[in-house]
Amino acid sequence: MAIVSQISRFITFTIISMGYSVLAVGVALTIHILSQLIVPKNPNEPPNVFSLIPVLGNAVQFGMNPVAFLQECQKKYGDVFTFTMVGKRVTVCLGADGNQFVFNSKQNLSSAAEAYNHMTKYVFGPDVVYDAPHAVFMEQKKFIKAGLNSDCFRQHVPMIVQETEEFFKKFNKPTGFIEAYETFGSLIIYTASRCLMGKEIRASLDGNVAKLYYDLDQGFKPINFIFPNLPLPSYRRRDVACKKMADLYSSIIQRRKDEKDNNNADLLQALMDATYKDGTHIPDHHIAGMMIAVLFGGQHTSATTSAWTILELANRPDIIKALREEQIEKLGSLKADLTFDNLKDLPLLEAAIRETLRLHPPIFQMMRRVVADKIVYEKNGMEIPKGNFICAAPGVTQVDPTYFNEPTTYNPYRWIEKTDPVHQLEQGDDANIDYGFGAVGISSKSPFLPFGAGRHRCIGEQFGYLQLKTVISTFIRTFDFDLDGKSVPKSDYTSMVVVPEHTAKVRYTWRE
């Protein structure tokens, strides 16, 4: 009887505890909802997007399809609004004015480092990029940009062609299927490593370096942005890989110094030869961190863009035909050698890549964190408080009918005919500002900013276009291809870059 009595009391206690828990959750939800509906809003701040769940906020809707979520919010709240994502308050600033506000914000008002360093420092290592003082980071960008010059690009094109042709030789004959993102992701690592990372890294790609890169890449996910340092195996592998990559670069640098091997047309050598303004040579761990950052920035953007370009072209045989005709007309034949100079003579090819970047920007949003007591959105006087993230969203603005005719249609010719409203806004007074690494080259008020703008504009844009032009040209020369009756796949938003769904396959046939 005593046992039965104890069991009965335990069951009763459990039921009561569960009841209190349910009641507590219900009360919390009710308070959260009523606080949004009843409590007066600050009229000087952007409107808040309604959410049902405290802390989590709008994270579920945003995570499922962030572009669609932001577009719906834009219809309801306008170009500027604030939503909550796992305790973080994000103020979104859409349109050309929103781009200008976010990308031109002064360092004492908002900070990219405060937005991203908690995640990137574990992947790139200490004292580089956002983990460095801002002035030092601008010097580091200048070093990297100096290593991405026309003389190097002329040497890079034949390297990329060779790597690409060797890679394609592994494809089955006469026909077969490739998974777009996986295939071009591998190819881009090979080409980028050959041109930028150094011959030693390229020679190691089929072994340990590829595994280290994969482990680092697993530390560059949305969960790492929300929770930068959890006691999980993937986080530990990330940290080990970062240390091993730094050690690897240090050993390569030391070998080059010992053997006086300094005649290398790669970025590694350019960084080894550079010095900071105070006259000190760049420390080995700085070089390693910058090289990792360059590889990540270039590989992610070029891998996704090359995959999306091939997928879009596979759905448009008329454009494939036109691209081949352009090469025959401008270069003489489809067998003519590709060079840094003659790639400039292919405007439709560049337009096809630009159109891909418009519809499928690898980074669909870019953020800063407010570090001043408040920051004022000049257009309407709204005040955004300290601690909020401010966010520009090229993935939304670049498909806005305000700026682009038939914005969801893949139409490379829009960049040649220049009839869209976007072409009236591309340049502004800030296009020639030099933040310490050369003129940025484009106004932050442009609605087309897949590479960002302002002091944090991507410095690898020229190399990216060069790499993409060479790879895409070689692919359309080598293969006929289509989507096997299917449509262009949907976007996968589960990583930090927007990739095609992993089921996206392209059917290819070797050309004579």
From Swiss-Prot:
Organism expressing this protein natively: Cunninghamella elegans
Pathway the protein contributes to: Steroid biosynthesis; zymosterol biosynthesis; zymosterol from lanosterol: step 1/6
Protein name: Lanosterol 14-alpha demethylase
Cofactor: heme
Oxidoreductase found in the keyword field: yes
Cellular component, GO annotation: membrane
InterPro entries: CYP450_sterol_14alpha_dmase (IPR050529), Cyt_P450 (IPR001128), Cyt_P450_CS (IPR017972), Cyt_P450_E_grp-IV (IPR002403), Cyt_P450_sf (IPR036396)
Domain of life: Eukaryota
Catalytic activity, as annotated: a 14alpha-methyl steroid + 3 reduced [NADPH--hemoprotein reductase] + 3 O2 = a Delta(14) steroid + formate + 3 oxidized [NADPH--hemoprotein reductase] + 4 H2O + 4 H(+); a 14alpha-methyl steroid + reduced [NADPH--hemoprotein reductase] + O2 = a 14alpha-hydroxymethyl steroid + oxidized [NADPH--hemoprotein reductase] + H2O + H(+); a 14alpha-hydroxymethyl steroid + reduced [NADPH--hemoprotein reductase] + O2 = a 14alpha-formyl steroid + oxidized [NADPH--hemoprotein reductase] + 2 H2O + H(+); a 14alpha-formyl steroid + reduced [NADPH--hemoprotein reductase] + O2 = a Delta(14) steroid + formate + oxidized [NADPH--hemoprotein reductase] + H2O + 2 H(+)
Subcellular location: Membrane
Gene from which this protein is expressed: CYP51
Function: Sterol 14alpha-demethylase that plays a critical role in the third module of ergosterol biosynthesis pathway, being ergosterol the major sterol component in fungal membranes that participates in a variety of functions. The third module or late pathway involves the ergosterol synthesis itself through consecutive reactions that mainly occur in the endoplasmic reticulum (ER) membrane. In filamentous fungi, during the initial step of this module, lanosterol (lanosta-8,24-dien-3beta-ol) can be metabolized to eburicol.
Gene Ontology terms, MF aspect: heme binding; iron ion binding; sterol 14-demethylase activity
Entry-linked SUPFAM superfamilies: Cytochrome P450
Pfam families: p450
Similarity field: Belongs to the cytochrome P450 family.
GO biological process terms on file: sterol biosynthetic process
Keyword line: Heme, Iron, Lipid biosynthesis, Lipid metabolism, Membrane, Metal-binding, Monooxygenase, Oxidoreductase, Steroid biosynthesis, Steroid metabolism, Sterol biosynthesis, Sterol metabolism
EC number per UniProt: 1.14.14.154
UniProt-annotated binding residues for heme: C458
